[in-house]
UniProtKB/Swiss-Prot annotation:
The keyword Signal applies. Its main location: other. This is CS6 fimbrial subunit A. The keyword Magnesium does not apply. Fimbriae (also called pili), polar filaments radiating from the surface of the bacterium to a length of 0.5-1.5 micrometers and numbering 100-300 per cell, enable bacteria to colonize the epithelium of specific host organs. GO terms for cellular component: pilus. Residues 1-18 form the signal peptide. It comes from the Bacteria. Keywords: Fimbrium, Signal. It comes from Escherichia coli.
Length: 154
């Protein structure tokens, strides 16, 4: 007797779910975009100096012209290793790499959530500095990584 009652309750609750209807209504959406923004392509210049293997040695620089309606700019490693640190990896031997950080023209470390104060049409250069402690021989080769340029639009 208990089995039959349980089955009837299950069937009764199944039937009530099958009859559920969804009421929908469309609402119009309208928005205005007031400013166009076109990010300029930055110029990336590798360093060919002898100090690349030293801590703080210049590895490469990123230069750009600040577009209109921008108050801050930041440049940071796409694959952030540890709080703003990137890794340049030798394309011929991935066991060879260089840890680096990017700083603005005043030497402040750049991160993705804050940038350097700028004015429109200003030329600004960010520097990628060797963050590996001590002096280290860096074998010649092509070292790759990716950086992101962030613009804070007014």
């Amino acid at each position: 007797m208990k089995k039959t009652i349980g089955l009837i309750l299950i069937l009764a609750s199944f039937g009530s779910h099958a009859r559920t209807e969804i009421a929908t209504k469309n609402f119009p959406v309208s928005t205005t975009i007031s400013k166009s923004f076109f990010a300029p392509e930055p110029q990336i210049q590798p360093s060919f100096g002898k100090n690349v293997g030293k801590e703080g040695g210049l590895l490469f620089s990123v230069s750009l012209t600040v577009p209109e309606n921008v108050s801050q700019v930041t440049v940071y490693p796409v694959y952030d290793e540890d709080y703003g640190l990137g890794r340049l990896v030798n394309t011929a031997d991935d066991s060879q790499s260089i840890i680096y950080q990017i700083v603005d023209d005043k030497g402040r470390k750049m991160l993705k959530d804050h940038g350097a104060e700028v004015t429109p049409n200003q030329q600004i250069t960010f520097r990628a500095l060797n963050y590996t402690s001590g002096d280290k021989e860096i074998p010649p080769g092509i070292y790759n990584d990716q950086v992101m340029v962030g613009y804070y639009v007014n």
